[in-house]
């Protein structure tokens, strides 16, 4: 429930500061791991996201293409782990190169769900996840843009409309190294003039 989620959030200034200090400490540990053992880091991230299950060959292939810096279109059946591949790559970029990623989703409900799960899963690595949609207040937008610029935000989840309107602001932060359009088949299903 929302009450349970809010109960776990830090409330006092001291709690917020302690949380941020722990995030920075975790981040430093995993950045060292990225420099010393990138394959080990990738395994740790995969384990955090899916446990002990092995990757499918198609997932390994997508990750190899992304690692090589290739633009990649991944078409897989539902439940075959497309999201896992780009989430792993984004986490690796954040820790190894301090690059941020933008994930574009067709629905705000999907953004909310993914943001919750990604934040919960990746916080142990010191990776920060934010949301920018048409529902974001001007202050929230300014804060996320500032965090993108200063390196304290690593992954932004947004909608096609927000991206189209604010792409220049996102680009000006200078840290975007990876962009993903999830559920891209919805683009062709939208009304004329949209998406």
Language-model segments: which ranges?
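Helicase-associated low-complexity/disordered flanking segments
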Residues: 1-72, 127-130, 171-184, 188, ...
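Membrane-integral, polyisoprenol-dependent glycosyltransferases
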Residues: 55, 79, 158-159
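ASCE RecA-like P-loop NTPase motor cores
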Residues: 68, 77, 116-120, 125, ...
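Pre-Walker A (Motif I) flank of P-loop NTPase domains
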Residues: 68-74, 99-101, 153-154
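Hydrophobic positions in the central parallel beta-sheet of the AAA+
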Residues: 74, 103, 130, 156-158, ...
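Conserved SF1/SF2 helicase motif Ia
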Residues: 75-80, 85-116, 123-128
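Conserved helix/coil segment N-terminal to the catalytic DExD/H
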Residues: 87, 95, 116, 136-178, ...
